[in-house]
């Protein structure tokens, strides 16, 4: 995740940035190899002190295991109103928040004539801010119980919507100084949203069906982030054609549309009630167990 945030968003930018910093291909290749080895070492280090699996718990889990189809699992997730609302929040926020990936650097380069040596650092700027914001709000969330995952998600998405409004105004009014402000807001908003949303994904996954629910949420994140990234690039090409090559209008319109999409996702989030969902799970799981038992009979 860290490498994905910090690396440039396009190959041309990466190559140009390397040229500007006088990196040779061999040096750059060595950097990637060393980075991969370092991250692999951290992964092995994270396993130290890992609790051993309890054989008694494993035997009990195997005894209670019931088979079900993937469609049955999806119906289980979709059958609850709270999970449907959370799905729309997760899908829309993921799609529109990362729509900036393929267009933010070209936006600065084409609208404000920034060179690649500067634009390729954008991901490092907002990515580093996002990491620091994530660490800070994890600590604050543990220290202050009032900072619930739902509240953090609300604040994070609201900041992201404001970020895209800033980028939209920057493009439409051609105010270069707003780009820097937008990068800071983007990093802080992503960090807060990351903490709150990951926490909500776990809260919206009942313990007995954690694999099913977490797998579904992860699938939603992957698919809709891809749709947002590809969709933004397609929309940019279409708007360039429709506006006769008016770059400020094309980029500004996409940023504004993303901001509106994030506001809609915020509305969906406001309808989600984690406590109601968790209180319903006893009934839902009992019904599911009876259906599965009848099927086995």
List where the protein language model places each region.
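Loop-to-transmembrane helix entry/capping segments in MFS-fold secondary transporters
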Residues: 1, 116-117, 205-220
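Intracellular loop-helix junctions on the cytosolic face of multi-pass helical membrane proteins
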Residues: 1-99, 114, 259-297
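Helix-to-loop junctions at the C-terminal end of transmembrane segments
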Residues: 7, 133-150, 236
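Short amphipathic helix-loop junctions that connect adjacent transmembrane helices
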Residues: 102-119
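Transmembrane alpha-helical segments of major facilitator superfamily
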Residues: 121-130, 221
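C-terminal ends and interior cores of transmembrane alpha-helices
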Residues: 158-174
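Hydrophobic core of transmembrane alpha-helices in multi-pass small-molecule transporters
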Residues: 176-194
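Intracellular juxtamembrane helix-capping segments at the cytosolic ends
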Residues: 192-206
């Amino acid at each position: 995740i860290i490498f994905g945030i910090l690396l440039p968003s396009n190959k041309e930018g990466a190559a140009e940035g390397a040229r500007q910093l006088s990196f040779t291909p061999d040096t750059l290749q060595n950097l990637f190899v060393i980075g991969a080895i370092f991250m692999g070492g951290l992964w092995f280090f994270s396993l130290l002190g890992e609790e051993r699996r309890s054989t008694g718990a494993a035997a009990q889990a195997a005894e209670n295991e019931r088979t079900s189809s993937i469609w049955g699992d999806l119906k289980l997730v979709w059958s609850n109103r709270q999970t449907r609302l959370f799905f729309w929040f997760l899908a829309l926020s993921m799609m529109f928040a990362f729509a900036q990936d393929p267009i933010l650097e070209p936006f600065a380069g084409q609208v404000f004539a920034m060179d690649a040596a500067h634009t390729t650092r954008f991901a490092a700027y907002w990515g580093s801010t996002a990491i620091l914001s994530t660490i800070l709000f994890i600590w604050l969330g543990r220290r202050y119980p009032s900072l619930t995952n739902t509240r953090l998600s609300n604040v994070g998405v609201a900041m992201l919507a404001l970020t895209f409004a800033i980028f939209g105004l920057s493009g439409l009014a051609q105010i270069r100084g707003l780009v820097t402000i937008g990068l800071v807001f983007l990093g802080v908003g992503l960090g807060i949203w990351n903490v709150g949303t990951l926490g909500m994904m776990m809260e919206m996954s009942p313990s007995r069906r954690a694999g099913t629910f977490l797998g579904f949420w992860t699938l939603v994140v992957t698919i809709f982030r891809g749709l947002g990234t590809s969709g933004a690039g397609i929309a940019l090409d279409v708007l360039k054609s429709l506006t006769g090559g008016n770059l400020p209008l094309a980029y500004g319109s996409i940023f504004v549309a993303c901001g509106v999409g994030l506001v809609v996702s915020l509305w969906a989030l406001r309808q989600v009630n984690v406590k109601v969902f968790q209180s319903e799970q006893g009934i839902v799981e009992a019904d599911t167990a009876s259906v599965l038992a009848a099927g086995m009979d």
